């Protein structure tokens, strides 16, 4: 059964659904959807989460990731299942169940806002800050370089998918390899960090909100917010790619 499941899932990553030359392979689709997960939200988002909500908020990010897997599957499944062969995604699903285009229009408007805010400004701002502090590159020069690269990717057909196909595996190797390296070479500190995360998730020191119960809720909310920012589960942003 395991081999059969692997054949129907993992082994289909490099196959195309269509024989057309401009169609996307399963791996390109997978890489494009994964590009939003292995990115700024998983690096800067976690650090910001700890800064605001404390170490305990990381635990609630784990909870968000666990339930987010099922949520991401449901939204992608429903978005593809409710497509009419031409349009697919959360907008088409909302239009079908709501029997009005208003919900689809609202989703599109909010998606544009989210793409400009959490989808572009945070990434570009974080990268520009790192380039400025690490290499002394002015922010406006870095922004100009990013603009040129974004233009080159945007004008080409399937350019984004082709770029993600090459970059995402490298990003994933560095991200997962770096994380495992920290755990392997610093096992005692990693164990202490995990213990601190679990402890502060349920028994934090009262600080910002003035009470232990309030701090737990604050830590939980911050962890769930940053978890959604990191994995985008429930936002419907990856459905159109699938």
List each language-model region with its residue ranges.
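Acidic, glycine-rich loop-and-beta core segments that form the ion-binding/anion-interacting portion
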Residues: 165-242
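N-terminal alpha-helical transmembrane segments of multi-pass membrane transport
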Residues: 1-36, 51-56, 68
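Membrane-interfacial loop-to-helix junctions in multi-pass transporters
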Residues: 17-25, 55-56, 98-104, 135-142, ...
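Membrane-interface loop-to-helix entry segments
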Residues: 1-7, 124-131, 135-186, 190-198
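Helix-loop-helix module between adjacent transmembrane segments
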Residues: 34, 64-84, 91, 95-125, ...
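Hydrophobic alpha-helical membrane segments of integral membrane proteins
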Residues: 56-63, 161-164
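Juxtamembrane inter-helical linkers in multi-pass membrane proteins
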Residues: 7-18, 84-97, 197-202, 239-241
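Alpha-helical membrane segments and immediately flanking helix-loop junctions
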Residues: 20-51, 86-91, 109-112, 212-242
């Amino acid at each position: 059964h395991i081999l059969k499941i692997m054949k129907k899932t993992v082994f289909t990553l490099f196959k195309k659904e269509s024989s057309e030359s401009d169609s996307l392979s399963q791996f390109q689709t997978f890489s494009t959807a994964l590009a939003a997960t292995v990115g700024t939200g998983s690096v800067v988002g976690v650090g910001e989460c700890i800064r605001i909500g404390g170490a305990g908020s990381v635990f609630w990010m784990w909870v968000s990731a666990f339930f987010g897997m099922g949520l991401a599957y449901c939204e992608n499944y429903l978005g593809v299942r409710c497509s009419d062969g031409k349009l697919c995604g959360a907008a088409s699903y909302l239009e079908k169940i709501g029997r009005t285009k208003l919900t689809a229009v609202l989703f599109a408007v909010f998606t544009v806002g989210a793409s400009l805010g959490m989808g572009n400004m945070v990434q570009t701002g974080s990268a520009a800050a790192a380039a400025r502090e690490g290499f002394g590159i002015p922010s406006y020069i870095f922004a100009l370089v990013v603009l040129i690269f974004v233009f080159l990717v945007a004008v080409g057909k399937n350019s984004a998918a082709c770029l993600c196909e090459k970059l995402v595996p490298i990003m994933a190797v560095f991200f997962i390899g770096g994380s495992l390296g920290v755990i392997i070479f610093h096992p005692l500190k990693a164990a202490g960090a995990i213990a601190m995360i679990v402890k502060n998730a349920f028994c934090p020191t009262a600080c910002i909100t003035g009470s232990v119960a309030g701090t737990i809720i604050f830590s939980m909310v911050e962890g769930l917010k940053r978890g959604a920012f990191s994995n985008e589960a429930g936002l419907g942003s990856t459905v159109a790619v699938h």
